[in-house]
Amino acid sequence: MNSGVSLCVLMAVLAAGALTQPVPPAEPAGSGLQRAEEAPRRQLRAVQRTDGESRAHLGALLARYIQQARKAPSGRMSIIKNLQNLDPSHRISDRDYMGWMDFGRRSAEEYEYPS
């Protein structure tokens, strides 16, 4: 759930960044103005090209993150299975609950569970 929300926020930020890029105004053709503005336009194109490359790299990272998020087990049951795999000598794993602690519980040797 958190990864889905963070993914949506990331996509919104990328979309907002794309929409806020400056667009050069259309001006009447003038030989003096064209020469003076050619250098800044070239620089702007180079910056846009670099920005596009970084967006492509960010898109590749985002695609890799989505693939890993889909492959990773999620939910309460996967966490419980991981906890049970950590300590195989734990006798009462089927009676434990996530986030619950009983400080007054007797040890497994002293207490016999009804079958």
From Swiss-Prot:
Glycosylation (residues): 31
Propeptide: 21-44, 107-115
GO cellular component, one term: axon
Ranges for region Disordered: 21-51
Bilayer-crossing regions: none
Highest taxon of the lineage: Eukaryota
Subunit architecture: Binds to CCK-A receptors in the pancreas and CCK-B receptors in the brain.
Post-translational modification summary for this protein: The precursor is cleaved by proteases to produce a number of active cholecystokinins.
Name the record gives this protein: Cholecystokinin
Entry-linked PROSITE patterns: GASTRIN (PS00259)
Record-stated family: Belongs to the gastrin/cholecystokinin family.
One GO process term, biological-process aspect: digestion
Keywords linked to the UniProt accession: Amidation, Cleavage on pair of basic residues, Glycoprotein, Hormone, Proteoglycan, Secreted, Signal, Sulfation
SMART domains according to UniProt: GASTRIN
Gene giving rise to this polypeptide: CCK
Modified residues (Sulfotyrosine): 97, 111, 113
Taxonomic source organism: Macaca fascicularis
Signal peptide per UniProt: 1-20
